[in-house]
Curated annotation (Swiss-Prot):
GO MF annotation, one: toxin activity
Something else known: The disintegrin belongs to the medium disintegrin subfamily.
Annotated protein name in UniProt: Disintegrin crotatroxin
Domain called Disintegrin: residue spans: 1-72
Cystine connections: 5-20, 7-15, 14-37, 28-34, 33-58, 46-65
SMART domains tied to this protein: DISIN
PROSITE patterns: DISINTEGRIN_1, DISINTEGRIN_2
Subcellular location: Secreted
Record family assignment: Belongs to the venom metalloproteinase (M12B) family. P-II subfamily. P-IIa sub-subfamily.
High-level lineage: Eukaryota, Metazoa, Chordata, Craniata, Vertebrata
Oligomer status and interactors: Monomer.
Motif (Cell attachment site): 50-52
């Protein structure tokens, strides 16, 4: 509990491996919507459409790539 990021790799520039907390100024450490310790801007495709699924896009508020669901 209390971990903000995966402290498995001391090489991660976004995460302090000793404390498992994000480094100062970092918004995220990993994830499809995280780039260079920052959230990727809203609307950026993080998982392209496949079959009956829409493109999944970043929210701008999270490092996760949410499932946007089936075509309407």
């Amino acid at each position: 509990a209390g971990e903000e990021c995966d402290c498995g790799s001391p090489a991660n520039p976004c995460c302090d491996a000793a404390t498992c907390k994000l480094r100062p100024g970092a918004q995220c450490a990993d994830g499809l919507c995280c780039d260079q310790c920052r959230f990727i801007k809203k609307g950026t495709v993080c998982r392209p459409a496949r079959g009956d699924w829409n493109d999944d896009t970043c929210t701008g508020q999270s490092a996760d790539c949410p499932r946007n669901g089936l075509y309407g």
